[in-house]
Amino acid sequence: MGLSQSTEYGGQTSSSEKSNPVSDKTLEELSYVLAERFATKCFTPLELTHLKDNFFSRAIDQGGLKYWNEKTLSDFLGIPDSSESHCPLDAGPVIFRMVSYLGAFPFQNTLAPSVLTFEAMVKVVVLLTERYGKVLRRARRDRIRLLFGSLADVGRKSVEQHTNGDEVSEDADAPAPNSHVPGFAIDEPANDDYEDEEDDDLALAALESLDAIEVFKHDSRMDRAVYEARISADTLRRLLMLLIVISPLKPLEPVKIYTSDLTEERMKAVRSEADDIMAAFNREPSGGISYKEFARIVTSSFPYLFDPLTPLFEHLLFSRNLNLSQKRNRADSTASEPVEEEAPEDDLPSPPTITLPGSFESVILNSSVISHLSFFLPSSSESLNFLRGNVRLHPVFSTVAHGSSLTSFSHHVLTWSSGTLLVLEGTDPTGEMLTIGAYLPQPWKSPNSTQSSSKFSNSVLPCLFQLSPKHLLLQGNPSSTIQQQSNIPAAYFSTSSGISIGCQIPPSSRSNQKPPTPHGAGSLTIDVSLETAQFHVSPVVRNGVFLPPPPGSTPDTTVKTTIEIYNLEVWGLVPDPTTTSAEGGKSAVELQQAKWDFEAQEAERRRSVNLKTGGSAAEESARWLLETAGLIGDGAGRRAGGSV
């Protein structure tokens, strides 16, 4: 299954060429060989057929070289481009820059920006959909450095022996018939003193598969003190805005479902979330973001940030104008065929919603906030974010709908038998708005609860986070020692102290009931009136439920923020309905309704109990019943709580 149609070497490799040792090949030839291996080993025959149809039916022919330009790529993917009259995102140039860099893999140092030939597009799709495991077995499933390079601008150091007034060319927009063009300077060695050996895993694995390690070493043997690479704030913000808009995208779902109705109100929310995410990155004095900072924040705070790129580029593997009911000879693919037009925007379906109907509608969550959450919250499995894992949010409790009562909170939350997402918004003493939340994959438990019906894996850890005005994430502590300590639950509820997340629970005492105390790297406490919250963050302590945020994200000392709560919501996590229906059993919604029905029946029974009638035995029996229910006596104080 060759790649002859767009290669600049004039066709498939001949048998005599195949017999030559790899070390005798040029970089362009090695790049071509890798693309051919990707094509044959990383795609099914049907996927490769669709990819060829999509590419060649739209390709521009210049002197026998077929390629895509920025407009072709943007139009196919449905990405707003600067050439459009109304373009609030203007993400086309950023995506084109990225793929022009990735198309030169693994020789970005000398071949990037590449012309988007078919061979280049094969590598782009393989890298962005993470299909390279069948070829690059030694590579980490880690694209951070590669993605950084595809986004980075270059600032040249004032090193006299290397300057001579030369400028680094980064023009990736104008395609040229020759694929050997000046490289991106991000791949010029830059005296990186962090993770050098790990950074090149993908490239080394690619060249190892070609027996061309020596070629790579020769290509990289340059002065590592000449260039500094930085991602500009504008470039990253434009990419973030696109990712926020398309984060719910499913495979083969039209992108325009999410990009066709970008009203000013919608764009205001998108910009707000992008700015909150941008605030998490410390910038250089020049305003750019270094690789070290980019890798640190993406790894620790946004593990799923680039997930939307996978379904976006999987569109290339399905052609709408390929008629599978007829045999079509596409071996040489030299002629373009008419491309089936997309449905008019008026006929596009509405974007699906993650929130289920229930007792209230959110005043905190909107589509942009949910996209922000999907960049770091897992689903019932750690491998997928909660959007790609098809998790749904069921409305459980809201202060707007149910009031600021702990009794109401207990009635709605403690009867929910799956994980929960707690979010609140309010102001700090300066009047600045904050949005804080906690992701609790295991259900809250009442004191006498012994079982959990959560469909979420125990390996999915809780986390504490701040969404605005600056993104901050405190990951769950994976230590089994911490998880087994019953006095340090992820979340705790008590009618006497309120709600405590990430706190240490003191021993119970009849004479002196002490409130839970903040413990470890982070905690959130909410008073009994649900009006005030305290958010504690410590930069170094690691003995609690949550781990410290990335270094440099917070001050060097413990910070306590008092929040006047405006709104508080608890959302139930409903796993993928297709998975849960296959497993059988009742859903969390059905179980909650059953508990409410049981509580109603018990309440009716209690009304018939009269402590002042009957003999002493009847009175004692009735009192015992109410104490057991935690409604009167010492049992009420001991049992008025819950944890998760």
From Swiss-Prot:
Q: Which PROSITE patterns match?
A: TLDC (PS51886)
Where mainly found?
Answer: cytoplasm
* Pfam families attached to this UniProt entry: TLD
Q: Where is it located?
A: Cytoplasm
Task: Give the source's domain of life in one word.
Answer: Eukaryota
Which residues does the annotated region (Disordered) include? Answer: 1-23, 158-177, 329-352
Q: Keyword Cytoplasm: yes or no?
A: yes
Q: Does the keyword DNA-binding apply?
A: no
Q: Which residue numbers delimit the TLDc domain?
A: 363-574
Q: Which GO terms describe its biological process?
A: response to oxidative stress
UniProt xrefs under PANTHER family: NUCLEOLAR PROTEIN 7/ESTROGEN RECEPTOR COACTIVATOR-RELATED, RESTRICTION OF TELOMERE CAPPING PROTEIN 5
The entry's function note states: May be involved in a process influencing telomere capping.
Entry protein name = Restriction of telomere capping protein 5
Source organism: Aspergillus niger (strain ATCC MYA-4892 / CBS 513.88 / FGSC A1513)
The gene for this chain is: rtc5
